[in-house]
């Protein structure tokens, strides 16, 4: 199992020499998935936006390095951009892949013939140097989720909704729901709860829980900002332009970063928020 992205790249000649490949999420049309780029960005010490959320920082040196590394997986190392990971993993064509941990559910049910021959592992990381001079591997990964919101002027409704939210997100409710749905539908319905205490009480093995616990400590999310919808849209455009048209990664990313920042400025003005006088 590769500890770092460099380890993964070093494995590719052996894997590809056996007519196999590795599955890395690509921003396709149906579901633009940039999680691997975001992971590389965080691992290099970068961020998607600046601290005041007034502009994107993908045009930083960390952002450019991460983008060059990510697109090189397809342009330089020949990883596929279109594939069905579950089918290829099951057949052995793709023995390694990086996907959200709920893919475990699908494989458990759809590939019973390889049960016990595979497992989950922590995300490949990037070697970094700490302030004291020691080296460590940064396994930061992109995390996202849903939220519960209350939109009403009624005080009674607010209180009732708040009580419901507290009950639904409680450990007891999450464990009960997770266990009952898995009892009815099987391991394909293993519940991806956001309650950390509830995860410990679901049907994960101790080895799997160890991986999940460790990866959770490296989870990073990015804030929602005014005009933020342009970020994913044009990051996807940038990746496709580099992989399809073979344009220069640095120049392509810098061009789209300017487009993203222009939209962020427009939306901040619409909402009466302060903007950067000189957006980088």
Predicted regions and their residues:
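Short helices/loops that flank or line small-molecule/ion binding pockets
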Residues: 9-15, 83-97, 237, 241-245
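Extracytoplasmic/periplasmic solute-binding protein
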Residues: 6-55, 62, 94-96
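Extracytoplasmic/periplasmic substrate-binding proteins
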Residues: 35-39, 43-44, 68-163
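Long, aromatic- and glycine/proline-rich binding clefts that accommodate carbohydrate-like moieties
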Residues: 121-125, 132-134, 179-241, 272-280
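Glycine-centered hinge/linker elements that transmit conformational signals in sensory
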Residues: 5-14, 51-82, 123-126
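Bilobed periplasmic-binding protein-like "clamshell/Venus-flytrap" ligand-binding domains
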Residues: 16-29, 170-180, 261-275
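Short amphipathic alpha-helical coupling segments at ligand-binding clamshell hinges
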Residues: 62-69, 156-168, 176, 252
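Periplasmic-binding protein-like
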Residues: 12, 165-190
């Amino acid at each position: 199992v590769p500890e770092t992205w460099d380890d993964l790249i070093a494995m590719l000649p052996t894997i590809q020499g056996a007519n196999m490949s590795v599955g890395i999420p690509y921003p396709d049309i149906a579901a633009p998935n940039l999680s691997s780029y975001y992971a590389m960005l965080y691992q290099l010490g970068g961020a998607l936006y600046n601290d005041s959320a007034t502009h994107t920082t993908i045009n930083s040196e960390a952002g450019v390095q991460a983008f060059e590394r990510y697109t090189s997986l397809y342009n330089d190392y020949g990883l596929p951009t279109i594939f069905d990971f579950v089918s290829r993993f099951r057949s052995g064509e793709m023995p390694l892949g990086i996907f959200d941990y709920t893919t475990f559910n699908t494989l458990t049910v759809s590939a019973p013939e390889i049960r016990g021959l595979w497992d989950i592992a922590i995300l490949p990381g990037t070697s970094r140097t700490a302030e004291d001079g020691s080296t460590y591997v940064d396994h930061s990964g992109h995390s996202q989720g849903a939220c519960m919101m209350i939109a009403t002027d009624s005080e009674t409704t607010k209180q009732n909704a708040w009580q419901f939210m507290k009950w639904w997100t409680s450990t007891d409710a999450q464990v009960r729901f997770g266990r009952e749905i898995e009892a009815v539908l099987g391991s394909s319905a293993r519940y991806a709860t956001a309650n950390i205490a509830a995860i410990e009480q679901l049907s994960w093995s101790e080895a799997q829980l160890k991986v999940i616990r460790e990866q959770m400590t490296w989870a990073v999310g990015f804030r929602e900002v005014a005009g933020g919808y342009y970020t994913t849209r044009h990051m996807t455009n940038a990746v496709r332009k580099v992989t399809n048209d073979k344009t220069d990664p640095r120049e392509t990313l810098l061009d789209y970063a300017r487009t993203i920042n222009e939209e962020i400025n427009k939306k901040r003005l619409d909402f009466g928020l302060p903007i950067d006088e000189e957006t980088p």
